[in-house]
Amino acid sequence: MSKPVAPTRADAMSAGKQVIESGQLERRLTDLVALRTESQDPAQTAVLEQYLREMMRPMLLEMGFDVALHDNPVLKAPPLLLASRVENPELPTILIYGHGDVIHGQDNQWNPGLSPFATVTLDGMMYGRGTADNKGQHLINFLALKTLIDLRGSLGFNVKVLIEMAEEIGSPGLAEFCAAQREALAADVLIASDGPRLMPEIPTMFMG
């Protein structure tokens, strides 16, 4: 009996393309954007935790992560999510950072008929508060991981995830949390998919 053929890079790229073309990415991002995770608005405190508990946690659990929500070291600051998926302690480990909070929606500054918390696609561009900062980025990272797991059954590396909900107000408590969780956050490389694109049509990568 011949051995099953291992998926190729082309197979992975094709599977990732299908996630986009099937509308899965757009549907999931629409659900994330719909939550008004405005960290600048004290009235949205419960929504910030809801994003972690109801949106991020189930997605990560589905991929075999151990997931925990932690109180913020700073009083009244929103919680943080820490997750890990260890296939083998001997394998390299990546740490993915993301934030689920957004700036004020500024509803009255959007074009008539549009809302910052309801996505819309115009001329191939998807609009909605958080699509580019930062819900879209960490969602893409997670869907890429899920695509590989579904395709190969494993990743071939370990993954840790840190998601905060207060980046837009200066990340209160993040430094203290990271110091306290130093061992839990230990990794070989950090992937922080946040920041500007120098040119819209060309991916930007900062190394260091």
Regions found by a protein language model. Name each.
Residues S2-T131, L148-F157:
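Acidic/His- and Gly-rich active-site-bordering loop/insert found
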Residues N134-G208:
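Acidic/histidine-rich catalytic neighborhood of metal-dependent amide-processing enzymes
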